[in-house]
Amino acid sequence: TGILLAFVCPPTTPVWMLIIGGFFSIVVVKQLYGGIGCNFVNPALVGRAMLLASYASAMTHWVGFGSKLPLVGSTADVVTSSTPMAVMKGIFSAETAEDALAAVNDLTSTFSISDMFIGRIGGSLGETSALALLLGFVYLLLRRVINWQIPVCYIGTVAVLTLISAPAGMSAVDFMLYNVFGGGLMLGAIFMATDYVTSPFTTKGKLFYGVFIGLITFLIRHFGSMNEGMSYAILLGNLMTPWFNAWGHQTPLGYKKPQKAAKGGKE
């Protein structure tokens, strides 16, 4: 939980703030509900949501790639930078076609797809390098720690929706790659949405769950006021997990539904 919380926070987040977030995630969200295996939502994402609501400025403060971070307690200046999702938000909030085209040019000139794939961009600790996240995905699959259904359905849903909603002046494939590689989508899909405790355990339930959180992420990114929707999409999916398990329940082969007894006690 502590590592995942650090992964979804900016590298300039103060240590004392991380301690507060870790306490809230582990003690309030996990231990008060019975400890390991008893929490019904992802503790790290709830901790991030709490920090974002309480310290919005610090949680949205980014540094550019290659910036020299100050040591603990230092007041050295850090060069601030935007993230791909923050720049992309200008495309959806544009009121005119000219503004949208200007936002597209700003996105493509500021960030390249190759930089986003390798990790030469600003962002939270665990979301900047799509390559590293893909390697982690392959490793977890080979070790049978996670299954493919949730990550593939989650990322695939966002990919399909962004392919069909690309703005004018930008290739649909490029727009899709910016959305897949940008933000915390891959981090959430691989390391957070697959949490055993808070995700469905039925095969069909995992498929429903992945599509659902992919849809919510797309809607928040494109129509909401926030730049990123991964955290809230997964938390909503966590709350829906019992229903996904029920919808994905498979009836055993040969099962016969018991017949009700006739009225009057006669069978």
Question: Where does each model-flagged region fall?
Answer:
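Long hydrophobic alpha-helical segments that form multi-pass transmembrane helix bundles
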Residues: 37-133
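Cytosolic-side transmembrane-helix boundaries in multi-pass membrane proteins
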Residues: 220-267
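A beta-strand-loop signature enriched in Asp, Gly, Thr, and Trp
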Residues: 151-153, 160-203
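Loop-to-transmembrane alpha-helix initiation sites
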Residues: 40-44, 176-183, 206, 224-237
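C-terminal ends of transmembrane helices
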Residues: 26-37, 133-144, 190-199
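Small-residue-rich segments of transmembrane alpha-helices in multi-pass membrane proteins
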Residues: 1-8, 45-58, 157-165, 183-191, ...
